[in-house]
Amino acid sequence: KLLLKLDCTFIKSEKYKNCTHLIAERLCKSEKFLAACAAGKWILTKDYIIHSAKSGRWLDETIYEWGYKIEKDSRYSPQMQSAPKRWREELKRTGAPGAFHRWKVVLLIRTDKRSDSLIRLSDTTALE
């Protein structure tokens, strides 16, 4: 409902190459989270949507980005907490199209849902 108050395009699909932002309630290892991180997309807390909707406009993303604040009592290491911010900044600085740019990888796995997920992840993150 809150997204409808703001000018945006909501992508609900297995393909999300054109995504610019991902809203995540918590850090996780999902395909979408990993792909967004490796592609240098903004990964933001749900408060970004809530506060932007209350303001009636999109707010600056910086303070809502995962990795902006590192929690000491988190089940996730500081490296994991800071990964979205670090990768976004690194890819912006270097101009690389993704975290795995120029990697050549062979996946020796059976074809199933999990392999489909890895293939989509490689497509999104500049993996060859």
Regions found by a protein language model. Give the residues of each.
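Phospho-regulatory, Ser/Thr- and acidic-rich intrinsically disordered linkers and terminal tails
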Residues: K1-C8, E31-L34, A38-A39, K46-E128
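The feature marks the first
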Residues: K1-S13, K17-L22
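Short, well-ordered secondary-structure micro-motifs within conserved domains or adaptor modules
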Residues: Y16-K29, E128
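Short, conserved beta-strand segments within well-ordered enzyme catalytic domains
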Residues: I23, W42-L44
